[in-house]
Amino acid sequence: MFRLLTAGESHGKSLVGVIEGFPANVKIDIEEINRDLGRRQRGYGRGGRMKIEKDRVEILSGVRGGKTLGSPISFLIENKDYANWEPYMNPEAVDGEEKRVTQPRPGHGDLTGTLKYGFDDIRNVLERSSARETAVRVAIGSLAKQLMREFHIEVYSHVTAIGSVSLGEPVENIEKIKRAEDSEVRCLDPEVEKAMIEEIKRAKEEGDSLGGIFEIHVTGVPRGLGSYVQWDHKLDAKLAHALMSIQAIKGVEVGCGFDQAQKKGSQVHDEIFFSQEKDYYRKTNYAGGIEGGMSNGENIHLRCAMKPIPTLYKPLRTVDIETKEAVLATVERSDSCAVPAASIVGEMVAITVIAQEFLKKFGSDSLEEIRKTWKSYTSI
């Protein structure tokens, strides 16, 4: 079983990832992982941290001579900013007072996490709850993406809304969606892109932040990933769970999602057709490629809503956990808008789930074994 763990604090020495159950004999391009880490760091609206960190992965185990061994893969991503934080984040002894935080930010896990674990310093919570953790999940997703490419499965994303500015009509043409890589905000329409950038500029000037919406498309997924036999085997449930675990994601839709609630069944269910050339196929994809908790052979289409980042340069009112007095929330260095970056994280989280379910279906010991099973199944 493909399992993963992440570890590390935002300003700690390194971030760490461990993957168990990754098949043997898969060629790994470490520079592709680094490129995906770089994609996560780009995007208009990112904060000053991205000028410090140039994320690169260092593989520690599980890969030899450019191929996976089938043993656990472990890696680290160095936090270059640790040099500035070492006195406050050293595992052995810290100068805690200077960077101690007692003013919880509304919208963050600051207050509840501090109360849950009995801390007197919110930094113990915010360092781990930070979205910096997603760098590890991007690296894991990049490995999963390279595995899935062996079976012609690819993943793409683009941003459809930032604040009040939205793209309008949905785009499902994959060649068009690929153009998101050329946009500062990963938007497919140059005029909408300009409006999004202006919206971010205004929010930044006001000391505020913006959320938005991004879409994920996974192509080439065979029928039958996931299952209807138990509630926790369903593919859409697993995808929603994983995507909702990304910091600041507050909603996930599959296919037409909430729009289906306002329509009749005849308007939202994808009719089934058959031909010798195409086998079973659909002319529409309202279901987003998943029916009954299983992939149905169409492209998987997901949509995620991201709330505005809770760290505001014009902070909201809160209560000091030490004095219990009314104060303004603490201000940590942060982004004004991270929706473009979140779309990359979403890609990687989605393809990781697809890889997990793919290996569950077709085996996981070695690439050769999986390929035989996959070919046998897809030739039926």
UniProtKB/Swiss-Prot annotation:
Source species of the chain: Alkaliphilus metalliredigens (strain QYMF)
Please give the coiled-coil regions recorded for this protein: none
PROSITE patterns, per this entry? CHORISMATE_SYNTHASE_1, CHORISMATE_SYNTHASE_2
Q: Which Pfam families match?
A: Chorismate_synt
What is the protein's quaternary organization? Homotetramer.
Q: Give yes or no: UniProt keyword Amino-acid biosynthesis.
A: yes
Q: What does this protein do?
A: This reaction introduces a second double bond into the aromatic ring system.
* One annotated Gene Ontology cellular component of this protein: cytosol
A GO molecular-function term, please? chorismate synthase activity
Put simply, this protein is called: Chorismate synthase
Q: Which reaction does it catalyse?
A: 5-O-(1-carboxyvinyl)-3-phosphoshikimate = chorismate + phosphate
Q: Which GO terms describe its biological process?
A: amino acid biosynthetic process; aromatic amino acid family biosynthetic process; chorismate biosynthetic process
Q: Which InterPro entries match?
A: Chorismate_synth (IPR000453), Chorismate_synth_AroC_sf (IPR035904), Chorismate_synthase_CS (IPR020541)
In the record, the note on similarity to other proteins reads: Belongs to the chorismate synthase family.
Binding positions for NADP(+)?
Answer: R40, R46
Q: Which UniProt keywords apply?
A: Amino-acid biosynthesis, Aromatic amino acid biosynthesis, FAD, Flavoprotein, FMN, Lyase, NADP
List the cofactors.
FMNH2
EC number(s) from the headed UniProt entry = 4.2.3.5
- Tell me which residues bind FMN: R128, S129, S130, Q247, A248, G292, K307, P308, I309, P310, T311, R333
- UniProt enzyme class: lyase
